[in-house]
Design a protein with these regions (language model features):
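C-terminal, loop-rich substrate-recognition/catalytic regions characterized by aromatic stacking residues
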Residues: 2-328
Length: 328
């Protein structure tokens, strides 16, 4: 989202709690979130379109659950006949996933999830009908899957995407579940191959507006490399759709508290410095078609400088990562 006067907001907060100054901060919404809208799938952003929204309480009574069932023709509001879908996804699925924790959160490099259509093409996908009106979500989407696998250890990755009329796809929320942790991280338990399990978990929190004419898309895979390590053996996942669903935290697009505009971002005057290096960050994917080997090369650019007043050298050195995997 856009830059805001974060320092001024912190000053208002601490003046209230430490100095007993009534800054009005406690009369404002408990939660303020940047509601993104029609964001293109890109590994780098200068800015994202959207607007600020607020809720006076959180959890908010204005958020309602809207359930979509996975079915034979995509997503539907009512259960359909049970259909079996089988996934054996490529080991390289996930190349458009971006970084789990972006290093340059200020948009310094290609670290965010890009266009999802290639990962979608190798996943089990369930698309909704084109939306007749805008649909906003705020919070965590809940997932229920009725599934079985053919190995004692397996992952399942679920992505909620914004499917656009031009064919592109933007990741809105996602989660990876290690199915041996289905009971909880406190009790790791291998799966029995062939046994059906009902698994429930939440996707990452999101504030996003799906606009009219776009489609909700649920994409399911057993791999998400290089964000997660591959399973010891390739996994075949069988999904039973009748008892599988997602539950969206839908927020009404109208109403709600008015948001006081943020002040412009401020910072102290910069000290005179001399730049030593300013190398760009990059992410390069190469594919050896003959061997099937895929390599990801990531470089975090160096950003060294010297503070002229006292000669202190600060900054980071360039770091590199190489990860590779071969299908099969």
């Amino acid at each position: 989202g856009p830059a805001i006067g974060f320092l001024q907001e912190m000053l208002r907060w601490w003046d209230y709690w430490l100095k007993d100054i009534d800054t009005g901060i406690m009369k404002e919404p408990m939660l303020r979130a940047y509601m993104q809208q029609d964001v293109p799938g890109s590994s780098w952003y200068a800015d994202c379109p959207g607007r600020w929204v607020g809720e006076m309480q959180w959890p908010s009574s204005r958020i309602s659950a809207k359930k979509f069932y996975l079915g034979d023709v995509g997503l539907s509001l009512t259960p359909t006949r049970d259909v079996v879908r089988v996934a054996v996804t490529p080991q390289t699925l996930g190349l458009a996933g971006g970084e789990w924790c972006p290093y340059g959160t200020g948009g310094e490099g290609p670290e965010f999830p890009g266009d999802q259509r290639f990962d979608d093409g190798a996943s089990i996908c369930f698309d909704g009908s084109p939306l007749r009106s805008d649909l906003e979500i705020l919070g965590a989407t809940k997932v229920t899957l009725d599934l079985s696998v053919d190995r004692p250890t397996a992952f399942v990755c679920v992505r909620l995407n914004d499917g656009k009329p031009d064919g592109s796809s933007t990741r809105v929320a996602y989660a990876v579940m290690n199915l041996t942790h289905r009971i909880g991280h406190h009790k790791v338990q291998n799966l029995i191959p062939g046994r059906r399990y009902r698994v429930k978990f939440q996707l990452s929190d999101a504030a996003y507006s799906f606009i009219r004419g776009h489609r909700l898309r649920v994409a399911i895979s057993t791999t998400y490399w290089p964000m997660i390590w591959p399973s010891p053996e390739p996994v075949e996942l069988t999904l039973h759709t009748k008892n599988s669903s997602i539950e969206l935290p839908v927020r009404p697009s109208r109403g709600g508290p008015k948001i006081k505009p943020f002040l412009a971002a401020e910072e102290g005057p910069p000290m005179p410095t001399t730049v030593l290096s300013n190398e760009p960050s990059k992410n390069v994917v190469s594919h050896d078609v003959l061997s099937g080997r895929v390599e990801v090369f990531t470089q975090r650019g160096a950003d060294g400088l010297v503070i002229e007043e006292h000669g202190l050298e600060v900054g980071g050195r360039a770091t590199t990562e190489r990860m590779s995997i071969t299908e099969g």
